[in-house]
Amino acid sequence: MSNFKSFKKVMITTFSFLLILLQYSCRNKNNFPLKITIASAGKVQSIDPARASTIKAHQLLGAVGDTLYELNIDGKLVPKLAASMPVLSEDKLKIIIRLKKNIFFHDGTPFNSYAMKFTIERFQNIGTMNYLLNKKIKSIETPNEELLIINLNKPSSSIKGLLTSINLTAISPDFYKNHFNKFLNDKFIGTGEYKLESFSNDLQTLSPNNNYWSKKPKNNGINFVGYNNSSTLYSALRSKQIDVLLSNSIEDTLRYKLKLLSNQYKIHEGESKPIEISFISLRTKIKPLNNKNIRLAIAKSIDRNLIVDKVSYGLRNPARSIIPKVLKK
């Protein structure tokens, strides 16, 4: 990043997803917890992969659907619906992907290359951000049920993003055949370990997919609940109305209180690698910040660690880039 850009956006900290969990008090005869309630701020407007654009919608899709590949904690591709790693042609214009066998959608229809082609072409047709994909993909070939070939317009440096995109979560062509040209916001048929039971903007209920092709869920389902503000979320966790809180949904003051409870072993805390950042932006069009030398001086003298301690109670880490490390790989 150039010096100029580093002043325009002074990085404060990376943003971690923390999972704050309570002990499950209710279990069934198989010793599996009853439905787990996961809470976060905001609403889900759509579960249609072609439209979903928020982190909350993506989390929901990750539970009910599968992509061709996923990224592991080191940022490397791991086959999901794909049977092996993708093969790139010598001219880097073809991505050749072999698919797993004996995978079925929630409606009982088979997953295959034709279904994946339908998924991609539907997104190209109506996807909210389809312009990003249409610039990359020239055409799609399906020589047989287990082979998918993606032809690119030109060599791409973002193949990982293409193959792991949650917006390309596989969907059933039979179920979506009447929605190739329009969104289906409140229903979903995919291949994931959970099935969508019911959908509203505030509450989404999932049940286990007993025919899931990989490891089966070890619970009786999930309730995704949306709350309006931090205080309500915090109170719901303290009163045991919810089991899991995605702590990026609450203010740092309350997150700090939860951290103290975790230190006292009253709740369980899990932390993932950061995938978002927060920053302070300087108004560079007004004096004296329109002076590059002033911005240089600020950048060299600013105490990022002090800001982290005072603003976020030390819960975040200083950063010098607008791109989280996990997304750079």
Predicted regions and their residues:
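Extracellular/periplasmic solute-recognition and catalytic clefts
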Residues: E197-T205, N223-I286, D309
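Gly/Pro-rich hinge or "lid" segments in bacterial periplasmic/extracellular proteins
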Residues: T164-P217, G221, S231
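Surface-exposed binding/hinge segments that line
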Residues: P86, R98, L132-Y176
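Periplasmic-binding protein-like
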Residues: K285-L327
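C-terminal motif of bacterial Sec signal peptides marking the signal peptidase cleavage site
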Residues: Y24-S25
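N-terminal lobe/hinge region of extracytoplasmic solute-binding protein
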Residues: A39-L88, E121, I189
